[in-house]
Amino acid sequence: MTPSTSDARSRRRSAEPFLWLLFSAGGMVTALVAPVLLLLFGLAFPLGWLDAPDHGHLLAMVRNPITKLVVLVLVVLALFHAAHRFRFVLDHGLQLGRFDRVIALWCYGMAVLGSATAGWMLLTM
């Protein structure tokens, strides 16, 4: 075994590729879904362009297990996308790289907390 091989095996694996995956998936999902939801619930329904669904219908939709799963995935990916973006804004934009561990822990911790809260809210609905 060469020294470089043993060094490579002894190093800890980074979670960075997984975090970049969540970032890109969250950005893609948010870019595709958020504008449609904003158009529908922010303009089309309030301005009367489309007939607004009643509260009972929306509640029945959200109580469907498949809809709950889709909403949870959307929220989790959007939160991790925002956490990753905010982390790198603080790290590179504001030059706070010396606090990277604290910033990463806080950003991703808030994303996990928000994801858990969303999951709990969807489960108890």
UniProtKB/Swiss-Prot annotation:
What Gene Ontology terms describe where this protein resides (cellular component)? Answer: fumarate reductase complex; plasma membrane
- Entry's Gene Ontology molecular function annotations: succinate dehydrogenase activity
UniProt keyword list: Cell membrane, Membrane, Transmembrane, Transmembrane helix
Entry keyword Transmembrane helix: yes
Query: Which residue spans traverse the membrane?
Result: 29-49, 64-84, 102-122
Mainly resides where? membrane
Query: Does the record bear Membrane in its keywords?
Result: yes
**How does this protein lie in the membrane?**
Multi-pass membrane protein
Q: Cite a single GO BP annotation.
A: fumarate metabolic process
List where in the cell it is found. Answer: Cell membrane
Q: Which InterPro entries match?
A: Fumarate_red_D, SQR/QFR_C/D
Q: What does this protein do?
A: Anchors the catalytic components of the fumarate reductase complex to the cell membrane, binds quinones.
> Mind telling me which HAMAP family this protein's record contains?
Fumarate_red_D
Q: How does it assemble?
A: Part of an enzyme complex containing four subunits: a flavoprotein (FrdA), an iron-sulfur protein (FrdB), and two hydrophobic anchor proteins (FrdC and FrdD).
What family does the entry list?
Belongs to the FrdD family.
Q: Please give the name of this protein.
A: Fumarate reductase subunit D
What is the organism of origin for this protein?
Mycobacterium tuberculosis (strain ATCC 25177 / H37Ra)
